[in-house]
Amino acid sequence: MFRRPACLSALCRFLPAIGLLTQLAAVATAADPKQATNVKKEEVWQAVYMIGQRVGYSHTAIEPVTKDGKSLLRTSFVSQFSYKRLGQPLVIKQILNTEETVDGNLLRFYFEIANPPASSTFTTGVVDGDQLILKQTVDGKVKESRQAWRSDVKSPTFQERSLKDTPLKAGETRSFEAFLPEFNSVTKVKLEAFDLVETPFFDGKSQRLLKVKMTQSAVPGMIVTAFADPRGELLKVSNSLLGNEMIAYQVSKEEALKAIAGAELDLAVSTLVKVKPIPNAHSLRSMRYRVTTRGQQVMEVLAPSETQTIKKIGDEVAEVTVTAMPIPDKAAIRPVEAEFLASSQYLQSDDSKVKGLAMAAAGDTTNPAEIARRLERYLYEKLNKKNLSTAMASAAEVARTMEGDCTEHAILLAAMLRAKGIPSRVVVGFVYVDKLTAFGGHMWTEANLDGHWIPLDATLGRGGIGAGHLRMLASSLSDDGPGAVSCFAPLVVAQLQIEVLD
């Protein structure tokens, strides 16, 4: 019995992260140092809608400051989103503060995601010559890292100021590189202006505005469409998320802060991909699907593996064959990259509680295959308190609370496997939900046994999986990789149609 359908926890957290790309409002500031002394503190409010329902707001404020005799710009961005997941409320608040030169070069930032009851995560960054010093706090523990840095990398808010200071004209393009805190990486941003179009607003009114397409390399499949007035100010910004449209409108403070109505958007229901019934999907040894990825190259969305073969039919269409790979009776551990065994900020395999759970679950067996089987079953039985209000907790947090949904099952299982010396990673994709006859966003775990990546799903507890999972991306959740939530990017931007062939 599948007990936790349509897991969208970390996906819900990823939506505000996309807000850094789609909602940082157009604030009247100058990118020309000569104009910096004329810049006054300004602010912009936005109301955010998804599938026609208000889901949150954002506020951007910017002010000129003088520091050590230099003119700088200080920007503050705050957003708050409210959703429902199978009837339970989920609230996520995001804060981004940046300090940059008047021509947009990033100097320092503070980034926070708050999602009660889980602990907040914080990231700070300070440019020190040719290095960016990052400090990330997860579950109260700080991890410091460094990245090579170029002085011309822009702030996350620069694209809007660029349009305001020097508005694009139809047919013009502009490119630059900017840092995205949620991804802990630099992305190449491209702006492309089209013609004036009649643009409708939430209040029924419309304006003729310049259509501007924004793309960036961090999430290649995501296209943000902005609509600018003659001053270069973005009055409306939209993009497709989870197969639906998210729109941010520039509004008054009073409009932005209006209470969200009681019938908040239920993402777990609104983002399902309906298919014909698949009897006993999680017991089947093999299944064929035709997958269409609207607006994206299908081979950039789906990931081949030992359990999933992909036959390309067209640029956006593929035939996918999913074949079950059961846990073997016995297995040995083969050499793998260190990242699949290392403790990390989200997979704290060295945490005392995580190690204790792994020991209790494994018992006296030393056979890695049997350990994997027992750990999966243990979490299926013990981690049975639903908490759909948490977006993405670390393994150590889950080990303390023993509550959550598919994300928490996958992360804790991966950490427990590593605590027993078994290489692991998490997988993002879609899973078939029997009761809803639909596929929903999901996360599960893979263990490396005898050199093969064997799928495990602690929300099912069946000793492996059948043919009801569609795989998109796998991640070690290494501290050296992109931000943890970024692994959900392909799932969030995907616009899938799934046809059951067998």
Predicted regions and their residues:
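Cysteine-centered nucleophilic/redox motifs
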Residues: 375, 402-430, 445-446
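Short, well-structured beta-strand/strand-turn elements
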Residues: 218, 240, 388, 420-434
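Bacterial N-terminal signal peptides
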Residues: 12-25
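Sec/Tat signal peptide C-region and signal peptidase I cleavage site
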Residues: 26-30
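Secondary-structure boundary elements
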Residues: 156-160, 324-326, 331-404, 412, ...
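Active-site rim recognition segments
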Residues: 248-261, 265-267, 333, 381, ...
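N-terminal secretory signal peptides that target proteins for export/translocation
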Residues: 1-12
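Acidic, serine/threonine-rich low-complexity disordered tracts
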Residues: 31-149, 164-329, 481, 490-492, ...
